């Protein structure tokens, strides 16, 4: 299998200082809320520390936060996930293999 070096560059999300924009938005919101609640400038240091943690998370896979948000938008919002046993809210039985279709 040949790897195309341009493929990753074309699909890479927008980043700020090594962190995706989704993670940066989370960092800014969390740091701002903590700064407002505590009125202390030490929370800015906590935000910088959180930035380095988020940078280590996105170092190996830059789409990890997009996958997390996609999961939250699909399966994370379902209230009856345990009842149906999956991501679908349909009460119909899911046919999983081709052999089950021929029965």
From Swiss-Prot:
Signal peptide: none annotated. Pfam families: VirB3. GO terms for cellular component: cell outer membrane. It is found in: Cell outer membrane. The chain crosses the membrane at residues 33-53. Induction: During the interaction with the intracellular environment of host cells. It is a single-pass membrane protein. Its main location: membrane. Keywords: Cell outer membrane, Membrane, Transmembrane, Transmembrane helix, Transport, Virulence. The type IV secretion system VirB/VirD4 is a major virulence determinant for subversion of human endothelial cell (HEC) function. VirB-dependent changes of HEC include massive cytoskeletal rearrangements, a pro-inflammatory activation by nuclear factor NF-kappa-B, inhibition of early and late events of apoptosis, leading to an increased cell survival, and, at high infection doses, a cytostatic or cytotoxic effect, which interferes with a potent VirB-independent mitogenic activity. These changes of HEC require the T4S coupling protein VirD4 and at least one of the effector proteins BepA-G. Interacts with the 17 kDa antigen protein that is encoded within the virB locus. Belongs to the virB3 family. This is Type IV secretion system protein virB3. It comes from Bartonella henselae (strain ATCC 49882 / DSM 28221 / CCUG 30454 / Houston 1). The gene is virB3.
């Amino acid at each position: 299998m040949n790897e195309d070096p341009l493929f990753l560059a074309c699909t890479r999300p927008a980043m700020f200082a090594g962190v995706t924009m989704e993670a940066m938005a989370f960092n800014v919101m969390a740091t701002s809320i903590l700064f407002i609640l505590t009125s202390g400038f030490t929370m800015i240091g906590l935000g910088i520390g959180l930035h380095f943690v988020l940078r280590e998370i996105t170092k190996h896979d830059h789409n990890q936060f997009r996958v997390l948000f996609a999961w939250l938008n699909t399966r994370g919002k379902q209230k009856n996930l345990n009842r149906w046993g999956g991501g679908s809210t349909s009460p119909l039985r899911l046919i999983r293999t081709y052999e089950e279709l021929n029965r």
